[in-house]
A protein has these predicted regions:
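Extended active-site neighborhood of metal-dependent phosphoesterases/phosphodiesterases
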Residues: 33, 93-206, 210, 234, ...
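Conserved aromatic anchor
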Residues: 376-388
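Beta-strand-rich modules
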Residues: 438-454
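Solvent-exposed loop/turn segments flanking beta-strands in beta-repeat/beta-sandwich domains
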Residues: 385-401, 405-407
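N-terminal active-site segment of His-dependent metallophosphoesterases
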Residues: 27-97
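Binuclear metal-dependent phosphoesterase catalytic core
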Residues: 253-357
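Extracellular fibronectin type III
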Residues: 455-467
Length: 467
């Protein structure tokens, strides 16, 4: 098979080739696809709703309004199902999962959409759900219920089957299989044997025709799956994974993983509030520039989720921010049946992520700050000149006198983890460089180029500055 270029990737699927006269990799705001999808489902992970010190609901930092906002968006998109990749509860407390169920019932009354369709719950437990009683930031459960026997009564894990039935109104299964509109889903709780999970999928391969045609089936876990399971799933050509736990922002394209270079598995972003790129960088950001990324707080405090749409020949993933709202960028589009090379492999993604660009006439603002901690302050305008490629970070190069060593810096783009149009300070990014780090010379040249999360780059803007 010939190499899939950016042009053929965009134009290869008839449903998305040309719309309103514009060539597309994904749908811009307000764009309506020419065909109704076969299946639509929302995806959440790591909600981490939590109790307060008095055992009630702690809505100060983890308000359920963002969960409700996500679910309401799913409802507006006519989802057929909602996936949760685990960690609905923060400390494994029964009421924490009940908070989640209450929000679901407010939005999907009787588990139905506004048109009366059944909305299927595809939920698994994460580590906080099954063993969260031992976790706790700020306070521990021992401070609320000092007596171990009393404390146990409040934990999901004390009777997961009974608690799940009482909360969700359906039996709990640690490993399960569901069918939604002809598409198959398999789920596995945290801590369960992945061998048993593989055996369940394998037992359904023939009866469910999982390997026939190009229709994908989905396996849902809390953490990314491990070697033995990955070896098995690599033999299932239509498999597609969804997992949480890592708390990475979906603005980062490194959250698309390939298991054994054959099976796509998407890390689903957390819905509870995070700054920067979350806790688990996975090494992806370390290699997109010649310097480590700084300024993660500028990326914004985000709460995210996904919407997946299935067509006959395409799988499309929409990435949303639910704190302030908005899209995180162009959809991820996977033509079905293309495997050599796989369209979600890193090399192929680099061909379609594009190159972010500054607008024509964009200028840097460089100011020397003479304070107790003297520095060079560089203000970078938002690189939104290419609507088909969103900026994730900037690489800054400072050049001094001839023969001196160049200084390399890198910084997250302001609001890179927020919805488009919700970047703080109009997307202007500030980088402060300590004066002691600057190369020698009375005149410095400062060059800044925009980067994507995969390291592709646009044209730099350059300015000279006299120290």
């Amino acid at each position: 098979m010939s190499v899939l270029t950016r042009k053929t990737f965009i134009e290869g699927a008839s449903a998305f080739a040309l719309t309103f006269g514009r060539r597309m990799f994904a749908a811009p705001s307000g764009w309506i696809p020419p065909k109704k999808p076969n299946l639509v489902f929302g995806v959440l992970a790591d909600t981490h709703l939590r109790i307060s010190r008095d055992g009630g609901y702690d809505g100060r930092n983890w308000p359920d309004k963002y969960l409700v906002s996500a679910l309401e968006y799913f409802r507006s998109q006519n989802v057929d199902a909602v996936v949760h990749c685990g960690n609905m509860a923060d400390r494994g407390v029964i009421d924490e999962m009940r908070f989640h169920a209450d929000a679901m019932r407010r939005v999907f009354k009787d588990d139905r959409s506004t048109d009366g369709r059944k909305v299927v719950k595809l939920f698994i437990n994460g580590n906080h759900d099954v063993e969260g009683g031992g976790y706790g930031a700020g306070f521990r459960l021992e401070q609320i219920w000092p007596d171990p026997d009393e404390r146990k009564k409040h934990l999901l894990s004390s009777d997961m089957a009974g608690n799940w039935l009482r909360i969700w109104g359906e039996p709990h299964e640690a490993v399960w299989h569901r069918e939604v509109k002809g598409y198959h889903f398999f789920g596995c709780d945290w801590g369960r044997d992945e061998t048993a999970f593989a055996e369940m999928i394998d037992a359904n391969r023939g009866t469910c025709r999982l390997d026939e045609g190009t229709k994908p089936f989905f396996f849902i876990t809390h953490d990314i799956t491990h070697d033995a399971f990955n070896k098995f799933i690599g033999g299932c050509p239509n498999a597609f994974g969804l997992f949480g736990h890592w708390h990475q922002s979906a603005a980062n394209w490194n959250t698309i993983h390939m298991l054994n270079e054959t099976t796509p598995s998407i890390q689903c972003p957390a819905l509870y509030p995070l700054f920067g790129d979350g806790k688990w960088l996975g090494g992806g950001d370390k290699y997109i520039s010649k310097a480590p990324l700084e300024g993660k707080l500028q990326g914004g405090q985000w709460r995210q989720g996904l919407v997946v749409r299935l067509y006959d020949d395409l799988l499309v993933i929409e990435r949303r921010e639910f704190g302030e709202g908005g899209s995180l960028g162009l959809d991820w589009v996977m033509p079905l049946g293309k495997r050599d090379p796989h369209p979600f492999s890193n090399d192929e993604l680099k061909k379609v992520i594009g190159e972010p660009q500054f607008r024509k006439g964009a200028k840097l603002e460089v100011v020397e700050e003479a304070s107790a901690s003297p520095c060079l302050r560089v203000r970078i305008p938002l690189a939104d000149g290419n609507p088909d490629s969103r900026v994730y970070a900037y690489e800054v190069v400072v050049i001094g006198e001839t023969g001196s060593k160049k200084l390399f810096k890198a910084v997250y783009a302001a609001g890179c983890n927020m919805g488009i149009g919700h970047e703080p300070n109009k997307g202007v990014t500030t980088l402060e460089i300590p004066k002691a780090e600057l190369p020698p010379g009375e005149s410095l040249t400062v060059a800044v180029r925009p980067l994507t999360s995969l390291g592709t780059s646009g044209r730099p803007i350059i300015t000279d500055f006299k120290v």
